[in-house]
Regions:
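Acidic/His- and Gly-rich active-site-bordering loop/insert found
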Residues: 2-101, 122
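Acidic/histidine-rich catalytic neighborhood of metal-dependent amide-processing enzymes
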Residues: 104-171
Length: 171
């Protein structure tokens, strides 16, 4: 990004993530969405992220392994493959809909936007971790998450809640 956030860029990046279906139980689909996130994030971040595997599952990381501030999210969804045929990504006024928009691909894009504003500052120690097993309880990534947050002063979970409240824990 050029230092200016544009709503069209946020919507377009969300659309691109949503149109890569990623049900938790489909490892190939989860690997594909991690690849898509890796490519999309390059437009937002000053340094590239990295794709890793943990517990047999793909994850995406950006920044130091133990950042002061960690943005935590996931790229898997509860929606089965083929859902996009019935419920396509759509924008109606100021509302985006489609499988994974709310939980939580729009939050991932918002995280990249936030990082784009701080990632150029050398004193900032921010990182991001995106897993692909949250919808089934984060069993494979639990140790990775625990390790990542150990030295962090703050962890911000990018997943929204239905009533707009701040989430303070994760499955």
């Amino acid at each position: 990004m050029d230092g200016h956030l544009r709503i069209d860029d946020l919507v377009d990046a969300t659309r691109q993530l949503v149109t890569v279906e990623s049900p938790t139980d489909d490892l190939a689909a989860c690997a594909e969405v991690v690849e898509a996130a890796h490519e999309l994030s390059r437009a937002w971040l000053s340094k590239p992220g990295r794709i890793e595997r943990h517990g047999g599952r793909p994850v995406w990381r950006w920044g130091p392994s133990s950042p002061r501030v960690l943005l935590l999210g996931h790229l898997d969804t509860v929606w089965p493959m083929g859902t996009l045929e019935r419920i396509p990504f759509a924008v109606d006024g100021d509302r985006m809909t489609g499988p994974g928009v709310f939980d939580m691909k729009a939050g991932v894009v918002q995280g990249w936007a936030a990082l784009s504003m701080v990632s150029a500052h050398p004193e900032g120690s921010c990182g991001m971790l995106l897993t692909t097993d949250e919808e089934t309880g984060s069993m494979a990534s639990r140790d990775l998450i625990a390790e990542a947050i150990t030295n962090s002063e703050a962890v911000l979970v990018l997943e929204p809640s239905a009533d707009g409240a701040l989430k303070t824990e994760r499955k």
